[in-house]
């Protein structure tokens, strides 16, 4: 008892843990590390528990315990697979053995007894039917083959054994679905009407089916004879009102007449197999085949024209073909009568609308559709590649990296190597070998001493010079005098050397292909406005230096920069111009004031026009006459409402007092000062 209690407790504990975890499934939306560790420990418990209870027959994993420590999820899964794969194989083999054993049943004993009773009743009924059949066969066949009855009886008994009766309750207990389907098929066959078996019957041929088929053919021939008798009464010389009457006449013939051997199909020999997929496929084909309907309509028109001239038999065959085509086009749905009539009405309306349209109308429809699609393409927003000049702000980010760009390289292209060029080169080389002209290109070497080497020789010494300033000047003076004495040469020789150098330079420029221009003379002299190209390039003497100058060298750049139009000016440029105008205005006012003061000093009569006294007198005269009026400050006597106004007024008064006091002090000082010129003798 103790081990059983222990087993039950371990399983109950595992179930409670799993129940707690699955009780709140919303927790699994986030990562639950605690639950994960708990589940791994549960798997270990169950694995170890299973290993303890294993029999000797079941050989699972060789590991007696599941190892979890320092193992990741994949390694734990691999340990479980080692255990599960052989056990699953063992159970599959065991189940297949039990299924093959017919004596084993999953039903309870009470139901088995009921099934046996039902089976015995069915066997009794079937025995009676078999006896009746045997008597009929004996009466029909005589003593030809007495063993056939016994064979039939044995086969029926074996069928009854194989087909036990199943109830609705049994379906919940039996799990072999394929076996159930086979047994139900056998039952259905047994329930059908038993047919008479003959000696000729085998797996493919049955005499009873052939007799039934012949009887059906005889009945159809009798119907044909009746129809022929009715057709003899029809007057073929009677006038026909319209095509509809003709169609109705021949339609009756089609319905009554049988099909020819050329038009027989699978459904004429075997029962039709109906399925929803076939119906939907036919419906889709009908809706998607407008062009095919037009072609079929044209073929029908041709057939009608041919049928008027052909004989009656040919006409009947053409009508049968048309009937077959129409039957293919028809779609039948398992709907009630009202719904069926509505659907057929809608389909007929669509067909009629399609049939009414002429070829010109169809062409116009296609053309209109094409025009609409082209207009839509033209009106839609074009991609940035087709919008002309596009800046980086207008196109999407990193879109230029996906494009292959074509741009020109300003580089001289290498000559194309052809047969002609190679032959020319070979001829030149051969000719030089014949002439023994081995004068290879002279190797040019860079001069060891740079032209501006003197710049490198100047060393900067950060230490304070120990020499005095007088000593430094003395040394510089001595160096200059020594150089002058050392460099004294014959002036005629110097002149001849200069002339020869200039001549050889011009001759080299004209004759030598690999000409190196004369390097610049190292002079500590800044030459302004000298074109840089003169010393690096050999140009003809007739060309002036002005043609080689850059635009900036011809005309100096404005300090403010390039001249801009009003549209090109920025906010800073506009502000700069405004400040400049204000400054000029201020300067004009200052100059005007200076001129006025000079006039006052020089001549009082001329300056009287602009003096303050004259202006004040004129104002008084104007006020007396009434032409002008003074604007008085009437707000002085009024009381101040705010503290800010009071303190501002007080501050102004104090400033005025301070300024008056300073002026008086300056006047006193001026009076006290005595000039030196007055004290001169």
From Swiss-Prot:
First-listed, main subcellular location of the protein, grouped into a coarse class: nucleus
Species, as recorded: Homo sapiens (Human)
Compositional bias of kind Basic and acidic residues: 148-162, 193-202, 216-226, 280-290, 319-329, 351-364, 558-575, 672-681
Record region (Disordered): 105-202, 216-364, 558-606, 660-681
Positions bearing the Glycyl lysine isopeptide (Lys-Gly) (interchain with G-Cter in SUMO2) cross-link: 350, 382, 394, 555, 632, 649
Protein name: U3 small nucleolar ribonucleoprotein protein MPP10
Residues modified as N6-acetyllysine: 609
Gene label: MPHOSPH10
Record keywords, A-Z: Acetylation, Chromosome, Coiled coil, Isopeptide bond, Nucleus, Phosphoprotein, Ribonucleoprotein, Ribosome biogenesis, rRNA processing, Ubl conjugation
């Amino acid at each position: 008892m103790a081990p059983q209690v222990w087993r039950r407790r371990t399983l109950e504990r595992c179930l409670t843990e799993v129940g707690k975890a699955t009780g709140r499934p919303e927790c699994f939306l986030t990562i639950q590390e605690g639950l994960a560790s708990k589940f791994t420990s549960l798997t270990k418990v169950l694995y170890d528990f299973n290993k303890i209870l294993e029999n000797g027959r079941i050989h699972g994993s060789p590991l007696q315990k599941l190892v979890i420590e320092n193992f990741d999820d994949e390694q734990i899964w691999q340990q479980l697979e080692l255990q599960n794969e052989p056990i699953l194989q063992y159970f599959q083999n065991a189940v297949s053995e039990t299924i093959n054993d017919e004596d084993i049943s999953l039903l309870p004993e009470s139901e088995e007894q009921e099934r046996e009773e039902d089976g015995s009743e069915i066997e009794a009924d079937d025995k009676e039917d078999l006896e009746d059949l045997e008597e009929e066969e004996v009466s029909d066949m005589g003593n030809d083959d007495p063993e056939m009855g016994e064979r039939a009886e044995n086969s029926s008994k074996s069928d009854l054994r194989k087909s036990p009766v199943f109830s609705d309750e049994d379906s919940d207990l039996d799990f072999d679905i394929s076996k159930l389907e086979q047994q139900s098929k056998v039952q259905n066959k047994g329930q059908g009407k038993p047919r008479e078996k003959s000696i000729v019957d085998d797996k493919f041929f049955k005499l009873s089916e052939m007799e039934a088929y012949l009887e059906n053919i005889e009945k159809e021939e009798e119907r044909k004879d009746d129809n022929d008798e009715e057709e003899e009464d029809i007057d073929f010389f009677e006038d026909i009102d319209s095509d509809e009457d003709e169609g109705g006449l021949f339609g009756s013939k089609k319905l009554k007449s049988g099909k020819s051997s050329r038009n027989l199909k699978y459904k004429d020999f075997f029962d039709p197999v109906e399925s929803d997929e076939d119906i939907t496929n036919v419906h889709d084909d009908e809706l998607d085949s407008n062009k095919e309907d037009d072609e079929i309509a044209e073929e029908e028109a041709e057939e009608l024209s041919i049928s008027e001239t052909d004989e009656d038999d040919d006409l009947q065959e053409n009508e049968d073909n048309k009937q077959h085509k129409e039957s293919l086009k028809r779609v039948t749905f398992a709907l009630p009568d009202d719904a069926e009539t509505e659907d057929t009405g809608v389909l007929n309306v669509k067909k009629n609308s399609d049939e009414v349209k002429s070829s010109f109308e169809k062409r116009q429809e296609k053309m209109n559709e094409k025009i609409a699609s082209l207009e839509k393409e033209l009106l839609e927003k074009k991609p940035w590649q087709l919008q002309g000049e596009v800046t980086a702000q207008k196109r999407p980010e990193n879109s230029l990296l996906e494009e292959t760009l074509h741009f020109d390289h300003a580089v001289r292209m290498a000559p194309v190597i052809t047969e002609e060029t190679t032959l020319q080169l070979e001829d030149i080389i051969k000719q030089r070998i014949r002439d023994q002209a081995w004068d290879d290109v002279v190797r040019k070497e860079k001069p060891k001493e740079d032209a501006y080497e003197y710049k490198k020789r100047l060393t900067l010494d950060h230490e304070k010079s120990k020499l005095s300033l007088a000593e430094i000047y003395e040394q510089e003076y001595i160096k200059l005098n020594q150089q002058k004495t050392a460099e004294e040469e014959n002036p005629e020789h110097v002149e001849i050397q200069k002339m020869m150098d200039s001549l050889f330079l011009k001759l080299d420029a004209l004759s030598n292909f690999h000409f190196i221009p004369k390097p610049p003379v190292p002079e500590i002299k800044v030459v302004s406005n000298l074109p840089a190209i003169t010393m690096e390039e050999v140009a003809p003497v007739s060309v002036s230096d002005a043609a080689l100058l850059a635009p900036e060298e011809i005309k100096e750049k404005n300090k403010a920069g390039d001249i801009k139009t009003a549209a090109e000016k920025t906010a800073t440029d506009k502000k700069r111009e405004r400040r400049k105008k204000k400054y000029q205005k201020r300067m004009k006012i200052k100059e005007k004031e200076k001129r006025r003061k000079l006039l006052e000093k020089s001549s009082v009569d001329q300056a009287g026009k602009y003096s303050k006294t004259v202006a004040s007198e004129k104002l008084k005269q104007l006020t007396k006459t009434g032409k002008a009026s003074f604007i008085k400050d009437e707000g002085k006597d009024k009381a101040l409402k705010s503290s800010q106004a009071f303190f501002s007024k007080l501050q102004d008064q104090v400033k005025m007092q301070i300024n008056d006091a300073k002026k008086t002090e300056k006047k006193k000082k001026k009076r006290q000062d005595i000039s030196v010129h007055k004290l001169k003798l």
